[in-house]
Amino acid sequence: MRVADFSFELPDELIARYPTAERTASRLLSLDGNSGALADLQFTAILEKVQPGDLMVFNNTRVIPARLFGKKQSGGKLEILVERMLDDKRILAHVRCSKSPKVDNIICLDNGYEMKMCARHDALFELELQSDKTILEVLEEVGHMPLPPYIDRPDEDADKERYQTVYNQTPGAVAAPTAGLHFDDAMLAALKDKGVKTAFVTLHVGAGTFQPVRVDEILDHKMHSEWAEVSQDVVDLIALTKANGHRVIAVGTTSVRSLESAARASAAELEAFSGDTDIFIYPGYQFQVVDAMVTNFHLPESTLIMLLSAFAGFDEVKTAYQHAIAQKYRFFSYGDAMFVTKKAN
């Protein structure tokens, strides 16, 4: 298939640049993968889409304030976007400036902090913090929330809360697992009251999630790598859920990719997984774990809309997106959501 097959025209006014007043106030487009049936709902209707005994799997990564502004010793301004924390002092990062820093160059940050350029790895720079503090402490002090480029505004104080799930736990993401942004504590409690089980995986979303696919044929695309973990407790819950005839519902494409990465790495039955994953899911992929998913509306020609098309059917997703645009759903990170059931193989 060609990347252009996943293109669509999106009016600029449908890009959500701010979240709704309440997390659960978004709209929800329901898509049945088998029939292609669509239903326009409010997000709170998710409680009607799930059944007692179903297992909802969330990504508990925490977004770090990964955008830093600084200067080279020569005085030139630069911007740093953390891709990954290597340890307490070192990061891999994208650096935007007029002239790339060289090895041993010092970068001056706000509040007197400094970083040394240690090495270059293709498009990424390895930087080391010159301080007694940890990199996470410095990011929390002087870093900015890494809003996606399509939001097209500076980050604000409110983004520290709203570009973060309420159940975040493990720092490391530089982009939010956005399907989870719609859930508040009351919604999670209501799911529990209904008898829906919950489980948590971790996938530290990288900046590569915003990188455009730069090839014509999807098979030529090289997927970026991200760190993910699926614990044995989660594996056991999935096995119990399936054995009892209930569904595994992934909240977000990152949860889908975590679970399917564990399945890909397992010899037979699903096993625990911890490590880097570069799983690329596109039409033709046979899903091993996930039966339904909650997801936001994705960018044209992105790997995420390819994943959704693999899950619910290429034509079905294309029709659903045309419907969403006509009905003026809000798109991307701060936008509305979908509840999607898998198309039978």
UniProtKB/Swiss-Prot annotation:
MF terms (GO), sorted A to Z: S-adenosylmethionine:tRNA ribosyltransferase-isomerase activity
UniProt GO BP: queuosine biosynthetic process; tRNA wobble guanine modification
Protein location: Cytoplasm
Biochemical pathway: tRNA modification; tRNA-queuosine biosynthesis
Enzyme category, top tier: transferase
InterPro entries: QueA, QueA_dom1, QueA_dom2, QueA_sf
Keyword Cytoplasm: yes
GO CC aspect terms: cytoplasm
UniProt keyword terms in alphabetical order: Cytoplasm, Queuosine biosynthesis, S-adenosyl-L-methionine, Transferase
Superkingdom of origin: Bacteria
Main location: cytoplasm
NCBIfam families (UniProt xref): PRK00147.1, queA
Protein purpose: Transfers and isomerizes the ribose moiety from AdoMet to the 7-aminomethyl group of 7-deazaguanine (preQ1-tRNA) to give epoxyqueuosine (oQ-tRNA).
Family to which this protein belongs: Belongs to the QueA family.
PANTHER family found in the cross-reference section: S-ADENOSYLMETHIONINE:TRNA RIBOSYLTRANSFERASE-ISOMERASE (PTHR30307:SF0)
Subunit architecture: Monomer.
Protein name: S-adenosylmethionine:tRNA ribosyltransferase-isomerase
Provenance organism: Shewanella piezotolerans (strain WP3 / JCM 13877)
Encoding gene (name): queA
